[in-house]
Amino acid sequence: MTELDAQKIIDFIANSKKQTAVKVTYKGHLNGRIPTSIQNFSNSDFGILYGDWSDIKPLLSGLNKKDYLIENNARNSAVPLLNIKDINARIEPGAIIRDQVKIADNAVIMMGAVINIGAEIGEATMIDMGAVLGGRAIVGKHSHIGAGAVLAGVVEPASAQPVRVGDNVLIGANAVIIEGVQIGDGAVVGAGAVVINDVPAHTVVAGVPAKVIKQIDEKTENKTALIDALRSL
């Protein structure tokens, strides 16, 4: 996958039209004609509107507040959520994935995961519950990012390097990987570790700050083996 350049992300956010998207369910007669910028599912005196608050608000001025319901979860948002309908991956309810994220085949995104703009998730990699992938974080193939783990994001400054996690890596629950750190292929990061330096391939690190405690051996491989069946679609 091609890495999304930081400056491109900055330009995308800076130049995007900021949106306060709302859904409005109403009864009665609206004040004025519904503009084409609004999705309109209405009959003569009842309907549902989808659009930007600045476009919809004037239409409600003639209604009693008891006659409409506004649903809204963002204000002046610069980045929409990713359209996930056709992604060849398992994405569970409650995951928050912003636009400009790349998700490879057979990846798994669990409930409550938060994945920011520019992040990349490799083939058959699992992002567990509540994990956070910051801007531009890159995870390779067949890895596991544990529940509550954080891969720190780097969008600004534009010259900063993102977190990069290799293939076949296991990152334990609630571990934190600091900006710019690289995790080598086949490494294991212990639960709760705070990783401030690069991790060599095929090593185990743990602690705060994380330090190498041993090389990967057969016993470790057996204890940390990932299950392919969880990644099948």
Curated annotation (Swiss-Prot):
Annotated EC: 2.3.1.89
Keywords per UniProt: Acyltransferase, Amino-acid biosynthesis, Diaminopimelate biosynthesis, Lysine biosynthesis, Repeat, Transferase
Disulfide bonds: none
UniProt GO MF annotations: tetrahydrodipicolinate N-acetyltransferase activity
Family annotation (SUPFAM superfamilies): Trimeric LpxA-like enzymes
Catalytic activity: (S)-2,3,4,5-tetrahydrodipicolinate + acetyl-CoA + H2O = L-2-acetamido-6-oxoheptanedioate + CoA
GO biological process: diaminopimelate biosynthetic process; lysine biosynthetic process via diaminopimelate
Top EC class, one word: transferase
Pathway(s) of this molecule: Amino-acid biosynthesis; L-lysine biosynthesis via DAP pathway; LL-2,6-diaminopimelate from (S)-tetrahydrodipicolinate (acetylase route): step 1/3
Function: Catalyzes the transfer of an acetyl group from acetyl-CoA to tetrahydrodipicolinate.
Protein family: Belongs to the transferase hexapeptide repeat family. DapH subfamily.
Protein name from the UniProt record: 2,3,4,5-tetrahydropyridine-2,6-dicarboxylate N-acetyltransferase
Organism field: Oenococcus oeni (strain ATCC BAA-331 / PSU-1)
Organism classification: Bacteria, Bacillati, Bacillota, Bacilli, Lactobacillales
